[in-house]
């Protein structure tokens, strides 16, 4: 998993993949769009959004 731009449905799919059964919380205030769509994010950064 390389650092990459993840936007919209791609971002949601990546969260499902990374978080699995733990699930995740998606709140725009958390800055995930800025971190992963406007910029690039890593697997480690995505894990911060898992429950």
From Swiss-Prot:
Compartments where found: Secreted
Could you state one GO biological process linked to this protein?
Answer: glucose metabolic process
Q: Which InterPro entries match?
A: Insulin, Insulin-like, Insulin-like_sf, Insulin_CS, Insulin_family
The family this protein is said to belong to: Belongs to the insulin family.
What role does this protein play?
Insulin decreases blood glucose concentration. It increases cell permeability to monosaccharides, amino acids and fatty acids. It accelerates glycolysis, the pentose phosphate cycle, and glycogen synthesis in liver.
Q: What GO MF annotations does this protein's record show? A: hormone activity
**Cross-referenced SUPFAM superfamilies:** Insulin-like
Q: Give the matching Pfam families.
A: Insulin
Extract the coiled-coil ranges from the record: none
List the disulfide bonds in this chain.
7-37, 19-50, 36-41
What does the subunit comment say?
A: Heterodimer of a B chain and an A chain linked by two disulfide bonds.
> What does the record give as the organism's lineage?
Eukaryota, Metazoa, Chordata, Craniata, Vertebrata
Keyword annotations for this protein? Answer: Carbohydrate metabolism, Disulfide bond, Glucose metabolism, Hormone, Secreted
A single cellular component GO annotation: extracellular space
Q: What is this protein called?
A: Insulin
Location (main, coarse): secreted
């Amino acid at each position: 998993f390389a650092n990459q731009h993840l936007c919209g449905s791609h971002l949601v799919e990546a969260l499902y993949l990374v978080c699995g059964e733990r699930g995740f919380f998606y709140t725009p205030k958390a800055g995930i769009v800025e971190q992963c769509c406007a910029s690039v994010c890593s697997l480690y950064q995505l894990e911060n959004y898992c429950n």
